[in-house]
Amino acid sequence: MGDRVILHSDINCCYASIEHLHHPELAGKPLAVGGDPEARHGIVLTADYIAKKYGVKTGMALWQAKQICPDITFVSPRMDLYLRFSRMAHEIYAEYTDRQEPYGIDECWLDVTGSSSLKGDGLLIAQEISRRMKSELGITVSVGVSFNKIFAKLGSDYKKPDAITTMYKSEFKQKAWSLPVADLLYVGKSTNRKLALFGIKTIGDLARADEDVLNSHLGKMGGILWSFANGYDDSPVKLENAHAPIKSVGNSTTTPKDLVCDEDVKIVLYILAESVAARLRENGFQCRVVEISVRDNELFSFTRQKKIDHATNITGEIAAYAYQIFKENYNWSKPIRSVGVRGADLVTDNYWEQIDLFSSVEKREKQMKMDSAVDEIRRRFGFYSIQRGLMYRDRILSAVNAKEEHTVHPHGYFG
């Protein structure tokens, strides 16, 4: 059996590139998306390449960016606009494969192994996607072409902007092993520091290291990273819209900025709970288990779940349980980058159970009616036609339409 053909497409400076399309008067001028430009607070979510040449970086405070790049223009984020472009990009990808796995709004893996007889080899498909993104959407992408997901991602990071890089079996050692080990997916700052203690500075150093030593100091992650560095990654690209029996309903997102307090997490959990609850109702299910997943900015992740008192598909109940689980299990040792909510142990809507006499049946019925009304309003007028008051506390965090954008992140190695 031949090698797989995996692409990783990354929209260059996604938010900033899209804003440039809508602000032609800023052509050739530095631009950054983030925070509240009028209030002069917040952080940079993304900067264009002109601003980056001045040293402007993602996560930098707006006032700092202004200091090092006085001519920079700040624009407020418009997540609905960026999501629309993301959908259009996925429509292009879908013409080459139904195996596409998003990694945030701007990145996506594509398994085009079965497309070569009709569309050409991986390099040819990458070139065609790159051309179409420019001509049809007006934006550029960097694409990695490889035999697995890890090196395809490394390939898209290898050269930017508007570039295509191959990482074939015959060449990955030559191209990848000299790169800093921090360039490898899932090597965060903390892991990078630990590896440095063993003299591991490059991907090649990691590949040549003793796997048992890595396992003893890094646990399961040591062996995983050693495998990645040596090209051993057989994780599949998920099949889009695969029709499998529904065992759980969940959603996760990498947030536009790091979450640093309970209030930040509460906003995102409610957005995700709205998505999960709405999908449960659409499919005629209720859940008896609520689960959350959390990944910090060092890419350490954990999941926790709770068996709840009664089956539910009520948004407020799922959100409240999710927030309770979070409060009981997270100590804020690090900021948070990614959050997920899942409803499991599903039963059908007509499932009967005895309700606790002390619970407010009337209150639950009112909540169910309210959820149904919200569902109908959003069906008719769009997701943003009605939002919870909580969402207005942070315009950036509340901008993602989690119901419509099921952003899935690779987590099979961290189960």
Q: Can you annotate each of these PLM segments?
A:
Residues 108-114, 303-306, 353-359:
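Short, hydrophobic beta-strand segments
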Residues 1-227, 237-240, 278, 364-415:
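Gly/Gly-Pro- and Ser/Thr-rich, intrinsically disordered tail segments characteristic of DNA damage-repair
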Residues 14, 37-40, 297-300, 346-349:
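Short, charged/polar surface micro-motifs in flexible loops or helix N-caps
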Residues 103-107, 146-149, 285-289, 334-338:
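Short Gly/Ser/Thr- and Asp/Glu-enriched loop/turn motifs at secondary-structure junctions
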Residues 8, 183, 191-336:
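DNA-contacting surface of Y-family translesion DNA polymerases
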Residues 323-380:
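C-terminal hydrophobic structural anchor segments
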